[in-house]
């Protein structure tokens, strides 16, 4: 029976927009999607959203290395991420970006409310500064040894080993990621969120019983060690949102990242023309349910900072956090050298999405345990469960129904009590899906599959088919088998969306949770076609080799204008002002005898002639083509005596050299002698 419909908003942690989705990411998105699909099957109103986490130092730095803008990079990465999630049938209602108008407005609103309510504090801090690059070093520009667990090579904001958060100044033996230099201390005014003011509220939330026991225990440790004010600002240069009325100061990425959940939902509401749901879901007294699926490495931000920010800005808090562990492959951390660091897109070139969805689901529980993807066990389990137990149940019976009875099922069940055993299991299996005890749900379903196959073995329709006068028995047995198959696939529909579509096409009926109470009787099914193919270790071997090759390709040096020719050391405006750039008309251009690189240019600066030797011959093999063209030259460069004569300046050109040299030209209207500023 359909439950009372609930309004539910579900999110996954926002993937960072500087890298590809891999199988570690997919655990969370598959877990959330299975849960969401189950909720939808039970008639609930579910909004399932996500976005790219698109701000911060790593994105700015990588874009610089690639020679593109951060906006261009995050745009390309968003398309890649969405393609990967669609390939795994992750049923998002909206996928957005934290670099959006909605997120900017909401970040500024929350910050303003926190400030007005007295939860933002200003103070001057000593901050690490790169003396070689002349810039303050945000968290991700600094690496060193964690001050808590002493793990080496950790970033300046949190430790990926023990999960601790800290300030960059607490790192042991810090180094600048940009230059490798040892940073020095400089003062800078920063903005802090007064997290300790919310300690009582957070402790009450922890004791409410909603959080996983492991999460609540970890939070208690943090309370006992004392909550600290949280630095929410970063100095320029930084890719993100500038803090209102604070030029050169930006919101730290972890302030606007969780607000991205709200921004993505706001964007979805706007797309729908829905003017009420955003407030209905996010208001302080909302009766909608809000769930965040996250990894155990970001519990600190989601269990402390995020609910405190929401409370302090008069929004509702999450109903619960659903936290999962990490993914290992073949019992070890994912390894690029071993080919077990596998991208989502690479997986889909060798296996279907349903296979990984099933394997992860079979291993997941409501606890925060790590999941091991054992590739040999993966092949065995998919073949044993999906192919041998479930799909085989249909194939063993469908042929007889199609050939002997024109696809029409029997008018009555052969064993109503057995069918009731299967439908009665809906309560236990449904509760397992609801409580995220996915492994238990799969075990219950496979136990039923064993019973169904045992029924077919005992009834032996292949024997009955050869016996005269037993057509009715044959139809009843095979119809019973197909009806049991239908119940099993209804229970598995949240896990196996692609297979479920094929099954629905064969059954000529939708797999609906509430409909299983009524078996398909006297119903016509379609011609049976192969539903799922066996997999083998050769596919695994090809997958691993492909992953190794991708790692080799990724390890190749980054190329591009900025990567090949890094920006030079910073100069002052006074230094730049010493350079006198002028528009020059090329009156004559000719080869230089004795040189295969130089052209001799005669330049008119509007009343003054200059003779310039320029190494652009390989790019301009016909000097005459340059005559009459305007360019830009350094007019106050000291004359340089060469064996061909004296060069009285330098023309400006772009490019790496050789044939790739591009002489600069001013727009039409510029006149010889005009200064370039």
From Swiss-Prot:
A motif ('KMSKS' region) lies at residues 333-337. It is found in: Cytoplasm. The keyword tRNA-binding applies. One of its GO terms (biological process) is methionyl-tRNA aminoacylation. The keyword Aminoacyl-tRNA synthetase applies. Its EC number is 6.1.1.10. Gene3D superfamilies: HUPs, Isoleucyl-tRNA Synthetase, Domain 1, Methionyl-tRNA synthetase, Zn-domain, Nucleic acid-binding proteins. SUPFAM superfamilies: Anticodon-binding domain of a subclass of class I aminoacyl-tRNA synthetases, Methionyl-tRNA synthetase (MetRS), Zn-domain, Nucleic acid-binding proteins, Nucleotidylyl transferase. Binds 1 zinc ion per subunit. One of its GO terms (cellular component) is cytosol. Zn(2+) binds at residues 146, 149, 159, 162. Its cofactor is Zn(2+). Is required not only for elongation of protein synthesis but also for the initiation of all mRNA translation through initiator tRNA(fMet) aminoacylation. Homodimer. This is Methionine--tRNA ligase. It comes from Salmonella newport (strain SL254). The lineage of its organism: Bacteria, Pseudomonadati, Pseudomonadota, Gammaproteobacteria, Enterobacterales.
């Amino acid at each position: 029976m359909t439950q009372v419909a609930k309004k539910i908003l579900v999110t996954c942690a926002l993937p960072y927009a500087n890298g590809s989705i891999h199988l570690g990411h997919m655990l969370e998105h598959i877990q959330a999607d299975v849960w969401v699909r189950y909720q939808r099957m039970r008639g609930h109103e579910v909004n399932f959203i996500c976005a790219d986490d698109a701000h911060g130092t790593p994105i700015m730095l990588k874009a610089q290395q690639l020679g593109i803008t951060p906006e261009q990079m995050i745009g390309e990465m968003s398309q890649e991420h969405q393609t990967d999630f669609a390939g795994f049938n992750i049923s998002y209602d909206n996928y957005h970006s934290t670099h959006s108008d909605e997120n900017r407005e909401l970040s500024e609103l929350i910050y303003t409310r926190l400030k007005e309510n007295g939860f933002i504090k200003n103070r001057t801090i000593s901050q690490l500064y790169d003396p070689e690059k002349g810039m303050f070093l945000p968290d991700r520009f600094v690496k060193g040894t964690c001050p808590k667990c002493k793990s080496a090579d950790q970033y300046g904001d949190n430790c990926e080993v023990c999960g601790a958060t800290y300030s960059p100044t607490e790192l042991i033996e810090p180094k600048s990621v940009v230059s490798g230099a040892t940073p020095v201390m400089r003062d800078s005014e920063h903005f802090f969120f007064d997290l300790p003011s919310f300690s009582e509220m957070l402790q009450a939330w922890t004791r409410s019983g909603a959080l996983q026991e492991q999460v609540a225990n970890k939070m208690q440790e943090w309370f006992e060690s004392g909550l600290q004010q949280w630095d929410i600002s970063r100095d320029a240069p930084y890719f993100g949102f500038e803090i209102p009325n604070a030029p050169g100061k930006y919101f730290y990425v972890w302030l606007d990242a969780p607000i991205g959940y709200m921004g993505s939902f706001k964007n979805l509401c706007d797309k729908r023309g829905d003017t009420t749901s955003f407030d209905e879901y996010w208001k302080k007294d909302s009766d909608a349910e809000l769930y965040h699926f996250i990894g155990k490495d970001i519990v600190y931000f989601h269990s402390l900072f995020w609910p405190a920010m929401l409370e302090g800005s008069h929004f509702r808090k999450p109903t619960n956090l659903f936290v999962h562990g990490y993914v290992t492959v073949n019992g070890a951390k994912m390894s690029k050298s071993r080919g077990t660091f596998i991208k989502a897109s690479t997986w889909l070139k060798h296996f279907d999405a349903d296979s990984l969805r099933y394997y992860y689901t079979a291993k997941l529980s409501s606890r925060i345990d790590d999941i091991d993807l054992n590739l040999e066990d993966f092949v065995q389990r998919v073949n044993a469960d999906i192919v041998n137990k479930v799909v085989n149940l249909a194939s063993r019976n469908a042929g007889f129904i199609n050939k002997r009875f024109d696809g029409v099922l029997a008018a009555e069940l052969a064993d109503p009590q057995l069918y009731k055993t299967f439908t009665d299991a809906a309560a236990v299996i449904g509760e397992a899906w609801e409580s995220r005890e996915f492994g238990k749900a799969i075990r219950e379903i496979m136990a039923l599959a064993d019973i169904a196959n045992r029924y077919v073995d005992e009834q032996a329709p292949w024997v009955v088919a050869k016996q005269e006068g037993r057509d009715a028995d044959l139809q009843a047995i095979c119809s019973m088998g197909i009806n049991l198959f239908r119940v099993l696939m209804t229970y598995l529909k949240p896990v196996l969306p692609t297979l479920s579509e094929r099954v629905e096409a064969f059954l000529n009926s939708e797999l609906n949770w509430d409909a299983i109470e009524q078996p398909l009787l006297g119903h016509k099914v379609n011609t049976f076609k192969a539903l799922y193919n066996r997999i083998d270790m050769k596919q695994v071997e090809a997958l691993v080799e492909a992953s190794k090759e991708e790692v080799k390709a990724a390890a190749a040096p980054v190329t591009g204008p900025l990567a090949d020719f890094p920006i030079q050391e910073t100069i002052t405006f006074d230094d730049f002002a010493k350079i006198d750039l002028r528009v020059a008309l090329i009156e004559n251009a000719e080869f230089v005898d004795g040189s295969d690189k130089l052209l001799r240019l005669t330049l008119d600066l509007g009343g003054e002639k200059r003779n310039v030797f320029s190494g652009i011959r390989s790019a301009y093999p016909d000097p005459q083509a340059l005559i009459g063209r305007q360019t830009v030259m350094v007019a106050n460069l000291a004359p340089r005596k060469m064996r061909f004569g004296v060069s009285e300046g330098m023309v400006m050109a772009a490019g790496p050299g050789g044939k790739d040299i591009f002489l600069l030209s001013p727009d039409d209207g510029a006149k010889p002698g005009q200064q370039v500023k």
